[in-house]
Design a protein with these regions (language model features):
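Long, charge-rich, low-complexity alpha-helical segments
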Residues: 78-127, 173-176, 502-561
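SAM-dependent Rossmann-like transferase core, predominantly class I methyltransferases
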Residues: 121-186, 191-205
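Acidic, low-complexity/disordered tracts enriched in E/D and polar residues
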Residues: 2-81, 154, 424-515, 559-561
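S-adenosylmethionine
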Residues: 159-170, 180-182, 197, 214-242, ...
Length: 561
């Protein structure tokens, strides 16, 4: 048996994705809300140690805690039943599920596709992963229950090529990166990379959301999760796939308060990348595209294309280049991605060519992995491990290393890509940087502020900047380093508490500007005061302070009205 066929035999089976009518979804939502099954309730059930272990994909401590709770009395709590069934893959009695979901019942959960038929002992097992997701944003509290395919932690098998991910680290990173300014239209490009979680967040502040994916299965999960959140859905997520039945969601579902009040309307379209939205423009695009750099030789060694992450070739250059035709004036696209390192600044040179002419581009590299680290991570992500299949793992890893060596790839960078269309034609700005620090708070707010203030700065000449009366941002602190006994500091650092958590080594000019920027004095007045104190050249110092002002405003250290 070839490595590919051996791996296929060990993959998790793909059950049809769940599908619910608006009435079924409303009943299930009400049951879940009444059950008290939330993030904090699960943590309390498991205990701190077991909950932390489960987040590290160590299942046993959580199983022990849940089994103890189920055996504690004749009527186990709904939280214990639902956690055991949907998060840990345990079988539970039909009677226990009937009690936990009284409106839906076990029979209804089977009809929806959440659980299988009862076994001879009168117990059922989950066919999908379902778990609570909670957060707080500008619109208030978020309380959802999100379905996805069962992970290998439960199945003990490698993931199927059409596997639909749950809410994971990458999805939450993108959700935090995305600006939440109210918009008319938004696009979730590739909603399968996280079971539609970006779609749900976009519906919080967009009047109309379009979600696309090449996978009918991913669209079906997105449709189900949207219905469970009380969202109106149009489209046929199951079209063209016997494994993804149509959701039947063509009318507006009743939105419960627990859904997070998703008032927007959702349209689902199937197709690759930007093809399904040809000729359409949006005010915001969010995407975690299938950017993994999987060489053909690796697939020949037995690793199949995973729909949620692999496109069969480098996808980001084509995707980013095509954004120009799909962004309204003032709109932005935010996405996650990776790129190859072949020299000192090679990644900047390569990625800069992706950004379309006339658009602003901001690329933030957050991490770099060496070739072995990168390949190992994605092999394990797909369920191919040395413990499970040493021969197959070594063959795939060797093919990956060979490909990188032949092409001179020294590492792979991970980070964020933000592309912005100016409100009016102008010279675009480009910033490609390495930032590994993080500030407090949600990064999406910072992204929105940076795009807005850079748009404003682009329309100001130096005289206009000199007339500004900036204010030091409230999250900025100053740090001075002095040699003992010295009167003056040798180093002055400005630290940003929010945003990207940047640290700037301040020159005399920058320190003076930050020290008195309270909105009372203009930049020009501050420059004149520094000249009077230091005797430096007035023209040169003013120019330096104007340039420093532009930079400090652009990165969020200074604010302007």
């Amino acid at each position: 048996m070839s490595p590919a066929s051996a791996r296929s035999a060990s993959e998790s089976p793909s059950f049809p994705p769940p599908a619910a009518t608006p009435e079924q979804a409303a009943s299930l939502r009400a049951d879940l809300a009444d059950s008290g099954w939330g993030v904090e309730a699960v943590a309390a059930l498991l205990g701190e140690v077991a909950d932390a272990a489960l987040r590290r994909e160590i299942r046993l401590p959580a199983l022990r805690a849940v089994r103890a709770a189920l055996a504690a009395g004749p009527a186990p709590s709904p939280v214990a039943v639902l956690t055991a069934l949907f998060m840990l893959g345990e079988s539970v009695p039909v009677t226990a599920l009937d009690a936990a979901l009284p409106r839906t019942t076990a029979a209804g959960a089977t009809a929806i596709g959440l659980v299988g038929e009862p076994d001879g002992a009168g117990c059922v097992r989950a066919l999908v992963d379902l778990r609570p997701h909670e957060a707080v944003d500008d619109a208030g509290e978020v309380r959802w229950w999100v379905a996805s395919d069962l992970g290998e932690l439960v199945t003990g098998r490698a993931l199927a090529p059409d596997h639909v991910l749950g809410v994971g680290g990458a999805g939450l990173t993108l959700a935090g990166l995305t600006p939440r300014t109210p918009v008319r239209t938004a696009l979730d490009l590739g909603c399968g990379c996280g079971c539609g979680i970006q779609t749900l967040y976009l519906l919080r502040h967009a009047e109309h959301v379009v979600a696309t994916d090449i996978s009918a299965r991913a669209l079906a999960f997105t449709a189900f999760n949207a219905a469970l959140a009380g969202v109106s859905v149009t489209g046929a997520p199951g079209a063209g796939s016997d494994n993804a039945p149509s959701s039947g969601l063509d009318s507006e579902a009743d939105a419960a308060s627990e859904s997070g009040s998703n008032a927007g309307h959702l349209e689902l379209l199937r197709g690759s990348l930007l093809e399904p939205v040809a000729g359409r423009r949006f005010d915001l695009i969010a995407s975690n595209p299938p950017f993994v750099l999987t060489p053909p030789a690796v697939r020949e060694a037995g690793l199949p294309l995973m729909e949620y992450r692999d496109a069969g070739g480098p996808v980001l250059p084509e995707l980013v280049a095509g954004l120009r035709e799909h962004l309204e004036p003032g709109a932005a696209a935010v996405m996650l991605g990776n790129w190859e390192h072949r020299g000192a600044d090679s990644w900047r040179e390569a990625v800069a060519t992706w950004i379309p002419e006339g658009l602003d581009g901001w690329v933030i590299e957050r991490e770099v992995q060496d070739p072995v680290e990168y390949a190992t991570m994605w092999l394990r992500d797909g369920g191919l491990t040395s413990e499970r299949d040493a021969e197959g793992f070594d063959a795939a890893l060797g093919a990956w290393i060979d490909d990188f060596e032949v092409r001179g790839v020294q590492g792979v960078g991970f980070g964020y890509l933000i592309v912005h269309r100016p409100l009016r034609p102008r010279d675009p700005w480009r910033l490609l940087e390495e930032v590994t620090t993080s500030g407090q708070g949600v990064l999406g707010h910072h992204v929105a502020e940076v795009l807005e203030v850079r748009e404003r700065l682009a329309g100001l000449d130096d005289d206009a900047v000199a007339d500004l009366r900036p204010v030091l941002a409230p999250d900025v602190t100053e740090e001075r380093h002095l040699i003992p006994g010295a009167a003056e500091p040798t180093v002055i650092l400005l630290r940003q508490g929010g945003g990207l958590g940047r640290t700037i080594r301040a020159s005399t000019v920058v320190a003076a500007l930050a020290g008195v920027a309270d909105g009372e004095l203009s930049v020009g007045q501050i420059a004149s005061a520094v000249v009077a104190l230091t005797g430096e050249d007035a023209i040169g110092l003013r120019a330096e302070m104007v340039e420093a002002t532009r930079h400090l405003i652009a990165v969020g250290f200074l604010t302007i009205d």
